[in-house]
Amino acid sequence: MDQKQLQALVEQISIRVFGKPFRHTAFFNPRLRTTGGRYMLQTHNIELNKKHYEQFGEEELIAIIKHELCHYHLHLEGKGYRHRDRDFRELLQKVGAPRYCRPLARNTKAPKTIYTYICTSCGLTYRRKRRINIDRYVCGRCRSKLKLS
């Protein structure tokens, strides 16, 4: 789905579900990580997370659009547009929009390598995330050389 298709979809949902036009811009924001979308109060634009569309499909995207359009229309009408406001919760139920979006599958990072250094004299061990120059650093207890194990 590209920008024009997304804009047309948001405008269509706004007319069909809310009976009011959407006169601003809706677009995919690649910087969004944990949220499905957001409504910008200053510009009245709606930003959506493309990863939700790719992972869960168009149904989930439509649900997120409905949620953000609830924020949009209530804010423009001067009513309570925040999650905690009664107007917002009632409109969510009326249009069948979810209160929260489904969580994305996390990309787990590979565990970082832990470097273990052992003192050649007293045997004290040092565990570090970063590699150190063993020619420059010595044991803090006995001042002997360190060895990477």
From Swiss-Prot:
UniProt keywords (A-Z) are:
Cytoplasm, Metal-binding, Zinc
In which domain of life is the source organism classified?
Bacteria
Q: Which cofactor does it need?
A: Zn(2+)
Recorded protein name is Protein SprT-like
Q: Which GO terms describe its cellular component?
A: cytoplasm
Q: Which GO terms describe its biological process?
A: response to stress
Recorded hits in SMART domains, A to Z, give: SprT
One Pfam family matching this protein: SprT-like
Keyword field contains Transcription:
no
The family this protein is said to belong to: Belongs to the SprT family.
* Binding-site residues, Zn(2+): H67, H71
Cite the cofactor comment.
Answer: Binds 1 zinc ion.
Boundaries of each SprT-like domain copy?
Answer: 6-147
Entry GO MF terms:
zinc ion binding
The catalytic residues are E68
InterPro entries xref list? SprT-like_domain (IPR006640), SprT_Zn_ribbon (IPR035240), Uncharacterised_SprT-like (IPR023524)
Q: Where in the cell is it found?
A: Cytoplasm
Species of the source: Geobacillus kaustophilus (strain HTA426)
